[in-house]
Design a protein with these regions (language model features):
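Surface-exposed beta-strand/loop patches in noncatalytic accessory domains
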Residues: 55-74, 100-148, 242
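Short flexible loop/turn segments that cap and initiate beta-strands
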Residues: 81, 216-249, 333-342, 349-353, ...
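Flexible, membrane-associating and regulatory peripheral segments of lipid-active enzymes
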Residues: 101, 376-465, 469-474
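Solvent-exposed serine/threonine-rich low-complexity stretches and specific carbohydrate-binding patches
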Residues: 115-143, 234-236, 243-258, 350-376
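Beta-sandwich interaction modules
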Residues: 126-160, 168-186
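Short acidic/polar inter-strand loop motif in beta-rich domains
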Residues: 157-159, 168-181, 279-287, 380-382, ...
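Beta-strand-rich structural segments
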Residues: 204-223, 322-324
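Lipid deacylating catalytic domains
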Residues: 439-675
Length: 675
């Protein structure tokens, strides 16, 4: 059995403010827990969903413009900034200021066709120079990673060039950055830009790029956007490296309407990128749009060699395939490994047999390093295939970002004659759990009951799990026989988060999960890749989630940009971007997804008012949404959709109540939960 055992140490500290929350439970004890990886597989009809995503399909649609504000001193001694911003929206326009010092700025906005500027009056709102103009404050962010914002809203104003003037008596340094803040304009125009990475191989030394184009959202009607040629006048890319260096690249505008800029990444760490597009709509109105992106670059680790150099039987029905690799540094990290197995059918055609994968550690023999990949021989019998066999679409990925270290189209797989004979004697007609997950370890081996220093409790529990950069969100009075997972106000990858949940859950013999936001994805990750108390639990629903961005959120990139001026806060999160989420989902089989029961929510609606969860995040999200997660991005294909409910928002800082406080839903989840 491919068993990897290590210890995860978790020290969780709860702040005094969070301890005062009425539903907070006692702090989690520090525990040590063994982790056993699963040897995962999937049937042939899932192979298409388990391929690496095309980055062209995981891009960001933008109807907004984010303009950097950099104050300079004028002759009068004032610090000032002025900009003219073309915008084609003619119905409703929102203007938002984001800066640590925005409350000390004097702001004047002149609408298209007007000569009188409208000053911001923070005590009385906007002076009524335009019908329906309003001033408001809000918070922009995700869970507790929030930044203060000021918003100006105009109704029924003409399209054209907006002029914004900002002055300040003093220049307050913003963390040594050249940018003091950001001005955001967002409207209701159908003309948007679609921007995507051209590669997910985000490894040091690689040349990657961003591609953008303008499209008409009304014509796209929810389908994959297509470029409208001739609308882009100019496009630029502003790239910020991990060391803070900022480079600006002109983007080449092609005849097909796509603008492209390529660059080489030479440093490990987090990058932010902003694409700015200016052009004219089909009716001749000038516009500006931007899109904001965050992505990590990882160090190179391995190269794949050309063939499987050893196949050995490691247990009843189990084979270990040794994939030879070459380490390109002195680091040999664990990897996510995935591959399709193909063989020849009775007609002589090569056909898929299964998809296999999981998290694995490199091993060493006299001939060098290899990665063990496990295959259940019963898949070969089920597919009724014979030699020759081969692996296709092989990928080695980083366990925390799912970024590919290396890929290969195909590798020849030669099985020993004894294995071929064993397969010929089989008559497998159905798939069982062991074929999908590998052999299970002993039930007591996944707890910490053999560690005298641990806080082993035993029994079964319902784990209440929070999300990214979050505190205690679940009112515990709505639940019974529960244990509160506490890793408050932290930024974890799905893999790190999953291991921490397992560490907490190892106090018990079995558990089910109710999770909020990222906690739902981390719980699914745990069930997919690791053996845990989830696998020995009983009940109607294994994992239940509320407000989980399974397909990502558009806020992730903007949060990274704001970190440059406000401070990092909880930091950027690749798994919560559209790109990172799609890479992660490409390794999650349907047998794991089918054990998830998910809920989505959005704001309440009334015909006579403008509806939202958060005024600030609404500028970046498509309706319906909960202030963080768009309804479409909260869907998990292959899982159980428990419905969409209005009148509930992502957190308690939004207009409608927090979705985790819904008593009726919580009581229902409690009654049906595994434990």
């Amino acid at each position: 059995m491919n068993k990897r055992k290590f210890f995860v140490f978790m020290a969780l500290i709860m702040s005094l403010s969070l301890a005062a929350v009425s539903w907070a439970a006692p702090a989690v004890d520090t525990v040590e827990s063994p982790i056993f990886t699963k040897q995962i597989a999937a049937p042939v009809d899932e192979i298409d969903s388990l391929t690496l995503p095309d980055p062209a399909t995981t891009g960001l649609q933008s109807r907004w413009a984010v303009v950097p504000v950099s104050l300079t001193q004028n002759r009068a001694g004032e610090w000032a900034w002025q900009s003219e911003i073309p915008f084609d929206s003619s119905e409703r326009l929102s203007v938002m200021l984001l800066s640590p010092h925005a409350d000390q700025w004097q702001v004047r906005v002149t609408a298209p066709g007007r000569t009188a500027a409208v000053p911001m009056d923070r005590h009385n709102g906007f002076r009524a120079a335009y019908h329906g103009a309003a001033y408001a404050t809000a918070q922009f962010g995700l869970d507790h990673n929030q930044f203060p914002a000021e918003l100006l809203t105009f109704e029924r104003v003409p399209a054209g060039t907006w002029q914004v003037n900002i002055t300040a008596n003093n220049h307050l340094a913003t963390r040594g950055q050249t940018v003091d803040g950001y001005l955001v304009l967002s409207g209701d125009s159908d003309y948007q830009i679609y921007t995507h990475l051209n590669s997910h191989e985000l490894v040091v030394g690689q040349s990657i790029g961003l591609e953008t184009f303008v499209f008409n959202a009304a014509e796209a009607d929810g389908q994959q956007p297509q470029a409208d040629p001739g609308l882009i006048g100019a496009a630029t890319l502003r790239l910020t490296a991990p060391n803070g260096q900022v480079d600006t690249f002109p983007m080449q505008v092609n005849r097909d309407g796509r603008a492209v800029a390529n660059f080489t990444v030479n440093e490990v760490g987090g990058y932010t990128a902003q694409v700015q597009v200016e052009g004219q709509t089909a009716t001749g109105e000038r516009f500006m749009r931007t899109s904001e992106h965050a992505f990590p670059v990882i160090a190179a680790a391995y190269r794949l060699n050309e063939r499987v150099n050893q196949v050995r039987v490691i247990g009843q029905n189990r084979l270990e395939l040794a994939l030879p690799i070459t380490a390109v540094s002195n680091q040999t990290p664990d990897v996510m490994l995935g591959a399709e197995v193909w063989g020849r059918n009775a007609d002589g055609d090569m056909v898929p047999v299964t998809w296999v994968g999981g998290i694995t550690s490199p091993a060493e023999t006299r001939t060098g390093l290899y990665l063990p990949l496990n295959l259940d021989m019963r898949w070969l019998s089920l597919a009724d295939t014979k030699p020759p066999y081969e692996l296709r679409n092989i990928r080695l990925q980083d366990v925390d970002t799912q970024i590919p270290y290396a890929t290969a189209d195909s590798i020849r797989l030669v099985l020993p004659r004894s294995v071929e004979t064993a397969v010929e004697r089989m008559n497998v007609t159905a798939v069982n759990r062991e074929m999908l997950m590998g052999p299970a370890p002993a039930a007591d081996s996944i707890t910490n009951n053999d560690n005298p220093a641990s806080a082993y409790v035993g029994g079964s529990r319902l784990l209440l799990v929070h999300g990214y950069c979050s505190g205690g969100v679940w009112p515990t009075g709505h639940f019974s026989n529960y244990s509160v997972f506490q890793d408050f106000n932290q930024n974890r990858s799905h893999n790190q988060f999953a291991q921490l949940i397992n560490s907490h859950g190892s106090q018990f013999d079995s558990f089910g999960i109710v999770a909020h936001s990222q906690g739902g994805a981390a719980s699914l990750h745990l069930y997919t890749y690791y053996w845990s108390g989830l696998d020995w639990s009983n009940g109607n629903r294994l994992i239940q989630s509320v407000g989980t961005p399974y397909q990502g959120t558009s806020l992730a990139g903007m949060l990274a940009v704001l970190g440059d001026i406000f401070g990092a806060g909880c930091g950027t999160h690749w798994d919560l971007t559209y790109d990172g989420a799609s890479l992660w989902l490409s390794g999650i089989p349907s047998w794991a997804r089918s054990r998830v029961y998910y809920h989505t929510t959005s704001f309440s609606w009334a015909w006579w008012r403008y509806d939202y969860c958060s005024l600030a995040t609404d500028m970046f999200l498509s309706d319906p949404e909960d202030g963080v997660v768009e309804r479409w991005a909260g869907q998990l294909s292959g899982a159980n959709n428990m419905g969409h409910k209005t009148g509930w928002c992502h957190t308690d800082s939004m207009r409608d109540p927090a979705q985790t406080h819904d008593y009726n839903r919580n009581v229902n989840m409690n009654a049906n939960a595994n434990r």
